[in-house]
Curated annotation (Swiss-Prot):
Disulfide bonds join C28-C77, C38-C68, C39-C51, C78-C89. Gene3D superfamilies: Hydrophobin. It comes from Metarhizium robertsii (strain ARSEF 23 / ATCC MYA-3075) (Metarhizium anisopliae (strain ARSEF 23)). It comes from the Eukaryota. SUPFAM superfamilies: Hydrophobin II, HfbII. This is Class II hydrophobin 3. It is found in: Secreted; Secreted, Cell wall. Its main location: secreted. It holds the Pfam family Hydrophobin_2. Residues 1-16 form the signal peptide. Keywords: Cell wall, Disulfide bond, Secreted, Signal. Disruption phenotype: Does not affect conidial rodlet bundles, conidial hydrophobicity, adhesion to insect cuticle, insect pathogenicity, UVB resistance nor heat tolerance.
Length: 95
């Protein structure tokens, strides 16, 4: 019985271990702000309006900035959008 409890504990620890998946690749940091977006306005580096996914897959923050600049928008790393709006964002690294 103790062996089963120890095996379950080890299996749980292995499943809960962090991986190298960052969501946005090398564009955005892992965690909450992991979704690369192109936004028309980023206010105080926290609130973003009219955000859309980039038209191409960016390689890094500079590439995201260039992709967004083609449409006159700013590169941002956002929380998962709710109702099509990404409200909580920060400026993308390298942008």
């Amino acid at each position: 019985m103790k062996l089963l409890a120890v095996a379950a504990l080890l299996a749980g620890a292995a499943i809960a271990a962090p991986t190298s998946n960052t969501g946005g690749g090398s564009v955005c940091p892992s965690g909450l702000y992991s979704n690369p977006q192109c936004c028309s306005t980023v206010i105080i580096g926290v609130i973003a309006l009219d955000c859309k996914s980039p038209s191409e897959v960016p390689r890094d923050g500079t590439d995201l900035r260039n992709i967004c600049a083609k449409t006159g928008q700013k590169a941002a790393c956002c929380v998962i959008p709710v109702a099509g709006q990404a409200l909580l964002c920060e400026t993308a690294p390298g942008a």
